[in-house]
Amino acid sequence: MTNLRKAHPLMKIINSSFIDLPAPSNISSWWNFGSLLGICLIIQILTGLFLAMHYTSDTMTAFSSVTHICRDVNYGWLIRYLHANGASMFFICLFLHVGRGLYYGSYMFMETWNIGVLLLFAVMATAFMGYVLPWGQMSFWGATVITNLLSAIPYIGSDLVQWIWGGFSVDKATLTRFFAFHFILPFVVAALAGVHLLFLHETGSNNPSGLSSDADKIPFHPYYTIKDILGVLLLVLALTCLVLFSPDLLGDPDNYTPANPLNTPPHIKPEWYFLFAYAILRSIPNKLGGVLALVLSILILAFIPLLHTSKQRSMMFRPLSQCLFWILVADLLTLTWIGGQPVEHPFIIIGQMASILYFMLLLVIMPITSLLENNLLKW
């Protein structure tokens, strides 16, 4: 068996990626989220496949087909809620994974990090299009509002929006193409995740200290396979509790009303995992400025390696940077809260302050603090 594992062309790839892979001996549970994201993606693809067998991407029947899945298909309700809440678990793992990368300086692996940013955009696009498919009120109006943002692009904006819509409004053509893209994108995400791993295995994993661990490596199996299985069990437990006890906790009640172009919901808002970006978008009174801020709120991650001024890689031994990191986390939670609130005083000014702080922290305050820490250590 050992010889086959190391000799067979396919097994050799699996062996060098998941079995005999040299891994640092001191990586903490924060390094579990990569494998958890893989599990989330598999869950989403499988549940999505079974949902697609019963779903119809037509404006007349989309909403009733989702109802049919929940009422008439064997365990259809379970598959539907696993898929909907699986997306939430996916984003929780994503945010923690990115946060880990920021804290421990994993962004210094430039190729891996940039593929990761690309993956984040791809997953966000997939989730947005998936939210449109049930064709409820929030699906329809969310699609209308977000696609309409592209009209802010000078010269080609309005033509681009109509091209994406496939007409003069969000209608049957839009729903059909969103379903097609929502089906294909997870496979693109899976391919990108493979490239992400490929680049990671070129350098080996980072570790909490941010120091080279070449002198102290252990095989991935059995140490980290067992550790990852624990993470998977906890993820599955959390997802199962969410699905079986409060499946609609993270959803919007408006989406249980069929889409009606003549009736606008009082508060149009996306799913909870987009609220921070939505708050940044709304905090700028200008349409084009808001769109740019929205894109930059994620794209800024690609510039993080260029803004690294510290002579230490990780924040493990940098208390000032640690404080700023947790302020950033609190700021993102504030933005998430603001994104779900109506556009009125005092939420407007809180959102604007939180948005300014978000960009200031990442672009100015953290790099300057890193330089200060270098000086304090007389480096």
UniProtKB/Swiss-Prot annotation:
Changing residue 7 to T: In strain: Isolate LAF1595. The chain crosses the membrane at residues 33-53, 77-98, 113-133, 178-198, 226-246, 288-308, 320-340, 347-367. Heme b b562 binds at residues 83, 182. Its cofactor is heme b. GO terms for molecular function: metal ion binding; ubiquinol-cytochrome-c reductase activity. The keyword Signal does not apply. Heme 1 (or BL or b562) is low-potential and absorbs at about 562 nm, and heme 2 (or BH or b566) is high-potential and absorbs at about 566 nm. This is Cytochrome b.
